[in-house]
Swiss-Prot record:
InterPro entries according to UniProt: GlpG_N_sf, Peptidase_S54_GlpG_N, Peptidase_S54_rhomboid_dom, Rhomboid-like_sf, Rhomboid_protease_GlpG
Name of the protein described by the UniProt record: Rhomboid protease GlpG
GO biological process, one term: proteolysis
Pfam families, A to Z: Rhomboid, Rhomboid_N
Transmembrane segments: 96-116, 144-164, 176-196, 197-217, 225-242, 247-269
Protein's job: Rhomboid-type serine protease that catalyzes intramembrane proteolysis.
Amino acid sequence: MIRVIAISNPRLAQAFIDYMATHQVHLTMRPSHDGQHVELWLEDDTKLTLVQQELEQFTRDPLNERYQAASWQSGDVNHPLKYHNNLNWQYLSRQAGPLTLTILLLNIVVYLWMQFAGDYQVMSWLAWPNDSQHMELWRWVTHGLLHFSLLHIIFNLMWWWYLGGQTEKHLGTGKLFVIMIVSAVFSGWGQSLFSGSHFGGLSGVVYALIGYVWLTGERAPERGIGVPRGLMAFSLFWLIVGYFDAFGLSIANAAHFSGLIIGLLMALWDNRHTFKNNNRHF
């Protein structure tokens, strides 16, 4: 699917959808990440040229009677908007691909294992490798499955579902897998320089996704992912709070910072063409 445009008025957006339907073009409306707009998405990319031509006319005269007439032709000008925002389990599962759900469930299983077997027992199998364990390759990523409190795991898994889900849905399972592996290794290495192997959590991967999804949304919104700027600001605030230990929390600051850096760098690389195109306009 291709993102066509973001519109602040949902009713006008629906009128354009109805009008394009008279041309046998199906558009889908979705809420934007900032909550202030709705986005129109095209399912058949072979019709993109036609949509762009019609959209140019629509933006010049959105109140033209032909768009209202199309809504009447569709059946009812007052029909409900065609996007869904109900937060139920079916909706939540639809927003997450197989890798997102698998990692989410693995984290829950490992957390329950830690409650029954104890932190030390589980860490002896999954923690970041010490000097004699570097060939136990799973340890380079499984430290991300370790969580030491209910708040810790809930916070990380909410972010993982929100960011990992949209990344997997729009960019594919392979892209999410690469981001996860690279950021787990890089953030784990960064944290190990300060605390050895005594740490755990998905936070490094989460911060990598925050950086990746935010910058991709800013530079290439047509790719369908993004983080509202308010949430990005909150994430940076939390990063600063960790460094100053404002609430007396034990936070893996190096993992957060390392993850954010690697996520931003990966987004810069994946969206490098957008920077080149923008530079040509100066």
